[in-house]
């Protein structure tokens, strides 16, 4: 019954997104049943339509459980998406918590040849471990977030998970983008209410500011080509997810945005369309304002003049 309920929730989320029609949603399934950290029998009977599993904002702590999950995913052609965090270590060392679980999961990916996608990588140690895993032939991909490229722990005390890191970590991520180690940029969008944020909930909104932050930081300041940013935010994510998107070619979905690269704009959190406004970019001056969004050939958003 638990497995049936899990699949019903997945199907309902995707159905609701299709009804709204503003973006495509591909819902994942948990690695362990009900996030209990140990039960993985459901992985053997997942329908073929399930291509990704994740424990969301937790890491699977038990090594044997995670190893068995990787073995099953290799047989079932499923990609593991990992939030790397050793929950026993994170109360006293967030950095080590990310690094040590990144290393473990990369080794499991190499050993079982299981596709692994590392989410919101934030430390030098983690990105270097991923680089080494790729060099050894592990089928690993990874992403970084706009906020981990923009802020340092000296400039922002906003609570997110993984935390905002040091300037050295930020530079390591940018260097990894430049060298091709980073496959994608993703937002880790978390629209928590003001009440939840006051209670200490980790996360921030990031979808609407993502392109402007990355274009300003990577292209305007670091001199990286726009084509690379487009690859990181569109083409490569679509490839990782197996979607016919990210290219303006016959056979691909007509999903794209129109942006103004030349006119600076100031982020106003009160004008965001998200259900919450927990945005640390409020007041930042950016380039790359999104003027219009087209999905499936239909205009779904147009900025005010």
Task: Please give the residue ranges for each predicted region.
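Single conserved hydrophobic/aromatic residue that forms the stacking wall/gate
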Residues: 1-9
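Short glycine/proline- and charge-enriched loop/turn segments
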Residues: 154-160, 195-200, 272-277
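A glycine-rich helix N-cap at a beta->alpha junction
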Residues: 13-31
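Histidine/acidic residue-rich metal-binding segments in metalloenzymes
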Residues: 40-185
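His/Asp/Glu-enriched, well-ordered alpha-helical/loop segment
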Residues: 96-115, 178-179, 183-185, 189-261
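Conserved phosphate-binding/catalytic loop of the ribokinase/pfkB sugar-kinase fold
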Residues: 33-38
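Short, electropositive alpha-helical surface patch
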Residues: 12-19, 127-142, 195-208, 238-246
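C-terminal cap of metal-dependent C-N hydrolases
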Residues: 253-305
């Amino acid at each position: 019954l638990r497995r049936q309920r899990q699949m019903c929730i997945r199907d309902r989320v995707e159905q609701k997104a299709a009804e709204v029609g503003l973006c495509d949603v591909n819902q994942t399934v948990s690695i362990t049943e009900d996030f209990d950290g140990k039960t993985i029998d459901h992985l053997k009977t997942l329908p073929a339509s399930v291509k990704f599993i994740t424990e969301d904002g937790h890491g699977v702590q038990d090594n044997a459980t995670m190893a068995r999950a990787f073995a099953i995913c290799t047989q079932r052609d499923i990609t593991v998406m990992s939030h790397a965090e050793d929950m026993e270590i994170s109360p006293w060392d967030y950095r080590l918590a990310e690094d040590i679980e990144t290393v473990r999961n990369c080794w499991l990916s190499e050993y079982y040849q299981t596709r692994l996608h590392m989410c919101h990588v934030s430390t030098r140690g983690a990105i270097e471990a991923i680089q080494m895993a790729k060099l050894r032939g592990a089928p690993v991909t990874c992403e970084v977030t706009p906020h981990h490229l923009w802020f340092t722990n000296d400039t922002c005390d906003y609570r997110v998970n993984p935390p905002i890191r040091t300037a050295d970590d930020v530079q390591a991520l940018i260097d990894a983008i430049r060298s091709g180690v980073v496959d994608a940029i993703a937002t880790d969008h978390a629209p928590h209410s003001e009440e939840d944020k006051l209670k200490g909930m980790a996360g921030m909104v990031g979808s609407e500011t993502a392109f402007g932050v990355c274009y300003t930081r990577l292209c305007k300041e670091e001199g990286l080509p726009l084509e690379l940013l487009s690859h990181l935010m569109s083409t490569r994510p679509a490839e990782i997810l197996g979607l016919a998107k990210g290219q303006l070619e016959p056979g691909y979905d007509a999903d794209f945005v129109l942006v103004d690269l030349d006119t600076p704009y100031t982020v106003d959190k009160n004008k965001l369309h998200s259900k919450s406004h927990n945005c640390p970019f409020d007041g930042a001056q950016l380039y790359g304002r999104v003027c219009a969004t087209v999905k499936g050939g239909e205009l779904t958003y147009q900025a005010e003049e």
